[in-house]
């Protein structure tokens, strides 16, 4: 392969060509960072967390493709991934994941000890998640914990502590991740049933759409409660109302369970995360 072809293969392995995963991981981290700093996060900490999010999401994708290397060739959406086609070897994927994880760890070394210690379970969750689809009926919940660890790390980095509020935000984000990743799982539902792996879309069964809606409502309800505790203003609650409207739009997209529409609904969650961050930002500025 030429250099450009290999670079393209590595970009696809780490999903740099599809940044939606990075954004969905970044938004709750930014929520936590802004709330922890009351709207004035340390610029160095902000840069470290943005870069760390990109590195760890990319590492997680490489690990995911390694874990699914025997499954992906049998799923229409994933059969052209670099590991599934043999363009990249399993050894290369592991080296990429290890290298990116090491870079992410080195990145946080200037931060306090608590943040560094929290990075250990965060890394273990990211590495182990792809394997939960073999035995755990709700792997999306496990992913929700993994995708939420940026929140306590943000509080630790900014304030030196992890207050109960941080864990409340973790709980909210957990339900959001279950909601949007179940939408994602609906895209591959037919293939996943044939292969025999486990997903929340399969576990919810005929209540899949209702389960997604319930998780979204729970997510927004917990954020509303967090806003009350923090005495947030109109911009925050206005953002939550807009997010609720976006959730209703998603419901109209997934109610017929058409794979293409479910995938669009999944992508739609980037707007939810962005709107909530905008509400937090404006609420602290105005």
Curated annotation (Swiss-Prot):
This is 4-hydroxybenzoate octaprenyltransferase. The keyword Signal does not apply. It comes from Nitrosomonas eutropha (strain DSM 101675 / C91 / Nm57). The chain crosses the membrane at residues 20-40, 43-63, 83-103, 135-155, 160-180, 209-229, 234-254. One of its GO terms (cellular component) is plasma membrane. It catalyses: all-trans-octaprenyl diphosphate + 4-hydroxybenzoate = 4-hydroxy-3-(all-trans-octaprenyl)benzoate + diphosphate. Its EC number is 2.5.1.39. Its cofactor is Mg(2+). Catalyzes the prenylation of para-hydroxybenzoate (PHB) with an all-trans polyprenyl group. Mediates the second step in the final reaction sequence of ubiquinone-8 (UQ-8) biosynthesis, which is the condensation of the polyisoprenoid side chain with PHB, generating the first membrane-bound Q intermediate 3-octaprenyl-4-hydroxybenzoate. PANTHER family: 4-HYDROXYBENZOATE POLYPRENYLTRANSFERASE, MITOCHONDRIAL, PRENYLTRANSFERASES. InterPro entries: HB_polyprenyltransferase-like, Prenyltransferase, UbiA_prenyltransferase, UbiA_prenylTrfase_CS, UbiA_sf. Pathway: Cofactor biosynthesis; ubiquinone biosynthesis. It is a multi-pass membrane protein. Keywords: Cell inner membrane, Cell membrane, Magnesium, Membrane, Transferase, Transmembrane, Transmembrane helix, Ubiquinone biosynthesis. It is found in: Cell inner membrane. GO terms for biological process: ubiquinone biosynthetic process. One of its GO terms (molecular function) is 4-hydroxybenzoate polyprenyltransferase activity.
């Amino acid at each position: 392969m030429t250099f450009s072809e290999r670079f393209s293969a590595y970009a696809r392995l780490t999903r740099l060509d599809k940044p939606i995963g990075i954004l969905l991981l970044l938004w709750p981290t930014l929520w936590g960072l802004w709330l922890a700093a009351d709207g004035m996060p340390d610029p160095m900490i902000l840069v470290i967390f943005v870069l760390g999010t990109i590195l760890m999401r990319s590492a997680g994708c490489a690990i995911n493709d390694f874990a699914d290397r025997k499954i992906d060739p049998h799923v229409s959406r994933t059969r052209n991934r670099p590991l599934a086609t043999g363009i990249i070897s399993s050894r290369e994927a592991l080296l990429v994941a290890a290298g990116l994880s090491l870079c992410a760890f080195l990145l946080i070394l200037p931060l306090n000890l608590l943040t560094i210690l929290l990075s250990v379970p965060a890394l273990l969750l990211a590495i182990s998640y792809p394997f939960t689809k073999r035995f755990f009926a709700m792997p999306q919940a496990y992913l929700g914990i993994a995708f939420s660890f940026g929140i306590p790390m943000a509080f630790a980095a900014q304030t030196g502590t992890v207050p109960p509020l941080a864990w409340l935000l973790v709980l909210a984000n957990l339900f959001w991740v279950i909601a949007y990743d179940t939408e994602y799982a609906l895209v591959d539902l037919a293939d996943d049933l044939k292969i025999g792996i486990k997903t929340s879309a399969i576990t919810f069964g005929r209540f899949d759409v209702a389960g997604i809606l319930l998780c979204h409502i729970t997510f927004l309800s917990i954020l509303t409660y967090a806003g009350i505790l923090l005495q947030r203003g109109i911009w925050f609650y206005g953002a939550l109302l807009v997010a609720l409207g976006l959730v209703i739009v998603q419901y109209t997209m997934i109610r017929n369970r058409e794979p293409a529409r479910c995938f669009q609904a999944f992508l739609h969650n980037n707007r939810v995360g962005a709107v909530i961050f905008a509400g937090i930002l404006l609420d602290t500025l105005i």
